[in-house]
């Protein structure tokens, strides 16, 4: 077992096609945009420049995260490292909001309801019908999951509940060996992990935004608590600007 500090890197996928269209995405499996691919490559360059070279990758079952990780690792010359994938790192399931325009949803339901669905810790959107065109209930990649485990909607609390077992059972053991661990995932699965790491309250987590494509580096002590709360973005100025853009997503036309 290696001694602390343990090195953890979090990377939200680059801009996706539905990010660009301002649509709720959730479990819908969309591709990166050209901009998103460039963000991923730049993320790998930032890792290489900082000397933060991952030894193992953990990612979701969704192509936007998988592709981001591939591009970043290729850019950092680490494409050869072991890869572990889990549905537990998937984006939050947005229920009946999946495929809907964020600005139109805001206009239809009002800011209070919109923000409750989008940012509250424990209020999920209405469930998505299992025969809906944007449902993943019968997707073959989830065939081994019991039906009661496959979500029809989720709040952030649900994401934390399904993500934390993977943190403790799969990511922590890699950290304990001294590996530098890269987690390439999604806005909400990473928000849930940061909530756990930094001890953010259920109320305050609503204000946390994670930008696309900019690595967030943590050094963790022997109890897996951050030596620097909030970690360190490898491009702080770009992260600050991107976080403001994420905040304003619902306001786009």
From Swiss-Prot:
State one molecular function term (GO).
phosphoglycerate mutase activity
Is Isomerase included in the keywords of this UniProt record? yes
List the protein's name: 2,3-bisphosphoglycerate-dependent phosphoglycerate mutase
Q: Which GO terms describe its biological process?
A: gluconeogenesis; glycolytic process
Q: Which pathway does the protein contribute to?
A: Carbohydrate degradation; glycolysis; pyruvate from D-glyceraldehyde 3-phosphate: step 3/5
Q: Which SMART domains has this protein been placed in?
A: PGAM (SM00855)
Q: Where does substrate bind?
A: 12-19, 25-26, 64, 91-94, 102, 118-119, 187-188
Alphabetical keyword list: Gluconeogenesis, Glycolysis, Isomerase
Lineage, uppermost ranks: Bacteria, Bacillati, Actinomycetota, Actinomycetes, Kitasatosporales
The gene name on file is gpmA
* Superkingdom of source: Bacteria
